[in-house]
Amino acid sequence: MKHFRTERVRATPKLFTYVLVGFIALLGLTCLYYGSSFAPGSRKSDEFDGSNNRVRTGIGSLRNRDIVLAVSRFEVPKSVPICDSRHSELIPCLDRNLHYQLKLKLNLSLMEHYEHHCPPSERRFNCLVPPPVGYKIPLRWPVSRDEVWKANIPHTHLAQEKSDQNWMVVNGDKINFPGGGTHFHNGADKYIVSLAQMLKFPGDKLNNGGSIRNVLDVGCGVASFGAYLLSHDIIAMSLAPNDVHQNQIQFALERGIPSTLGVLGTKRLPYPSRSFELAHCSRCRIDWLQRDGILLLELDRLLRPGGYFVYSSPEAYAHDPENRKIGNAMHDLFKRMCWKVVAKRDQSVIWGKPISNSCYLKRDPGVLPPLCPSGDDPDATWNVSMKACISPYSVRMHKERWSGLVPWPRRLTAPPPRLEEIGVTPEQFREDTETWRLRVIEYWKLLKPMVQKNSIRNVMDMSSNLGGFAAALNDKDVWVMNVMPVQSSPRMKIIYDRGLIGATHDWCEAFDTYPRTFDLIHAWNTFTETQARGCSFEDLLIEMDRILRPEGFVIIRDTTDNISYIKKYLTLLKWDKWSTETTPKGDPLSTKDEIVLIARKKLWSLPAISVS
């Protein structure tokens, strides 16, 4: 908080003295009321109501003005309100009710209404999102791959709509996932083998000896394709919007499958260039020809040299006039993009991306799509519009005619070639990897008394740096969403070059995922970085609570002052089932002032409402 010093004023008339004292008192009360606007790490004019009152009203009336805010930076509200049960699946920046209230003019044909649009500070839901009635601790991996509690996601629309496609089946108090999909009714496992056979990979293994590791599955449904890729040592970023199928990604996350909400619309996906070896579309209902092929060009940006696009859709095989017309137009576009058909069988076609810039340079002048201008950064993604141009390879990639990455799993710990682009040496990379290996060992010693087998599956690293935290968890049956804060976004490419997945994000805003997504959230210096950007600690804590599962853990590594402040929130957030803190051992990444706090969230429910 800023401190204002007043000089002693001498005045003879008593009346003037009384007026001055009264003015200072009024000024003090004003600062007291608005103090959080100036306090480091505090929310600007965000207030909480008292007691356990639920927030029942519309988005514009969620603030209770009766609370007296703290003078000290380390004071906190007496309570944090609970959101109304209607908001048990709230995703703040994908809230279509907000679009109507703010009268946003979004182009529905371009899918802008499925993109990231956050509420202004005065319209934020600063309340704890409750679980649905009857919520249970999720079934543990690997059981969860095939079944989840119906009460946790009480939506059966997909089971009815896709009953003939083996997406999901309601079975008493559970929902089962047979492994089918719109295109692979007989199971994703058989479909994956068929793709490997089409590509003539040894042993019918789609990972091709570890050369294929990262996959982007667009329009993924309930992510059964990604679920069955895991046994092939392939990790997929399964992507789908919160559309008419609404809860498909929520089901995927409940199952413990790497997945996220997103759409190919007008903005670049939050992943750097050259992140994936393979992109997949199985009847994903995307118009790939729109806007001069801009959506295919986004896939082109994301694919590595020689990467594959698996397209299983009627346009690839149907012989009716309409589908043939679309298929021919796509073939023409791919040809101009220098892609070639690698394999075609039954209802699937696989296209291959060139391994260098040679074909681009041989095209006739004026051929569309053009190459992107030299000033375009293909790794810039946060709130950056897609571009209808081809991102050429770097000089190094063009010369070497490949990504330069070693096969998985060696690539997890081998220094990737693109380190030089962010000014990190191989020695620094190895040191970072070893540091995080030792840190995770210490974390697990602290967690061991509370962690049961397979009780942690979905993990988020809020500030992933070079991916060392996720790499150190590779021997555990978990997957990690590596989040790269916008101020460090150039490092995101290293995450993908290690065979990991993640997304760029601004922690001054809500993350685009469902409530109760993660079993463990790791925050290293995240609060210090948030404070430096002038954003709210309280907003960040409430957002962490929204995406943390009941009985999930947070590991917060930050300064002593920040940890002291956060500890005062543990009871308010219901993170007081268990907690511990320690002063960590010094290491190359440590600061002199550093504390590790681990806390566990309670399983709680809304109190019953008495009807008079």
From Swiss-Prot:
UniProt GO cellular component terms: endosome; Golgi apparatus; Golgi cis cisterna; Golgi membrane; plant-type cell wall; plant-type vacuole; trans-Golgi network
Spans within the Cytoplasmic topological domain: 1-14
Entry superkingdom: Eukaryota
Glycosylated position list: 107, 383, 562
UniProt cross-references to InterPro entries, sorted A to Z: Put_SAM_MeTrfase, SAM-dependent_MTases_sf
Keyword list, A-Z: Glycoprotein, Golgi apparatus, Membrane, Methyltransferase, Signal-anchor, Transferase, Transmembrane, Transmembrane helix
Topology class, membrane: Single-pass type II membrane protein
Gene Ontology biological-process annotations: methylation
Compartments it resides in: Golgi apparatus membrane
Main localization of the protein described in the UniProt heading: Golgi
Assigned EC number: 2.1.1.-
Lumenal side: 36-612
GO terms assigned for molecular function: methyltransferase activity
Transmembrane feature ranges: 15-35
Family: Belongs to the methyltransferase superfamily.
Name of the protein this chain belongs to: Probable methyltransferase PMT9
